[in-house]
Amino acid sequence: MMRGLVRLYGLLWLGLLWFGLLQFGLLYLASISVADEFTERILFEEDTDGFKLYRIPGIVVTAKGTVLAYCEARKFTEADRGEIEIHLRRSTDSGQTWSPAVQVAHLGERLPRNPHMPEKKKSKNMGGPDEQTVNNPVAIVDRDGTVHLLYCVEYMRCFVIQSRDDGVTWTSPVEITRAFEPFREKIDWQVIATGPGHGIQLRSGRLVAPFWMTDYDGRLPLTHGVGVIYSDDSGNRWQAGELAIPRGGEPNIAELSDGSVIVTARNTDPRNRRMAAISPNGATDWSKPIFIDSLLEPGCMAGIVSHPGDGVQEHRWLLYCGPDTTDRAHQARRDVTIYASRDDGKTWPIRKRLHRGPSAYSDLAVLPNGDILCFYEQGVEQRHGDRGRPWAYRYLAVARFDLEWLLKPE
């Protein structure tokens, strides 16, 4: 009888132990699930690796699922011009780990400086005569596995390089500045700049890159605006589309559910709302630009991306990110917020703050499993720090989240 009781107690003890381990395992899995709804990692930090500042983020996911995060690496100053390189980090595990940063784009011949710049910047340190600005990287992912990276040099010449191994190696640069020349009929530009952010490939196979241009001398009535260039032969030849948003700047682009294309743009209008236009083919026949009442515009670059959703609904999700403020002072850029539309941008009923505090430029990408990546400029309040004011550019951070996180109330 004693032996039977011992065995019974032993079985009870094992049962309790198993039950406890099971409960612990379920709690652990639940905690992992909650934690993984939103994660964030710092990819670049100011005053590291010999560079003063990292700005102007862009992010894409390749056909094989590799994440490419790229930016401007500003060597000596925080300014938009000077010695600036394009740096890239790669992730082959959906953003959990990242390769070291490498310089890409324009590693060969150095080009002369652009003598034209805004009047307000002439008194600032924009670099010496031997420095070179490589600016505004814009990647486009091709379904055939190629990644096309467009960028500008000195805000006046445009080049493209290609990678067929998910950003490990790149071809030599090919200049495509001639594709921008037809726009001189409307804006006699002295400055061109792709994106920033990313471009897109349409269902038709067309590659589309948005850009902005400026004429500082006012030689024609229209002095600045947003247009697109495109390629219908896998990036071998680039040509001009049409002016999409007069008086717009720093555009982003996405394909809508019906195959049409939306471009939205930064602007200086006192309504402080994002401007948008739509084209049936991503290049021509742009609609008259409108202001999107739900999307605040403080004079800042923003990100946009099309999301397939559950694949069942007729309309895709359209996601947008930008600062949640209308204060146009650079030190006031803050509270980067994600907006979501289920009707191709007609309404934006869903919004959620991604970062509380100083934050600015941002870009969006979608992983193969539907999770969303936001690569953005993140800062600190620093009210009593070195600058004595909020600073939105200390880090470049990549946040990963899913639609479930986005739909939960703050």
Where does each model-flagged region fall?
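Asp-box/BNR beta-propeller blade signature and adjacent active/binding-site loops
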Residues: 35-410
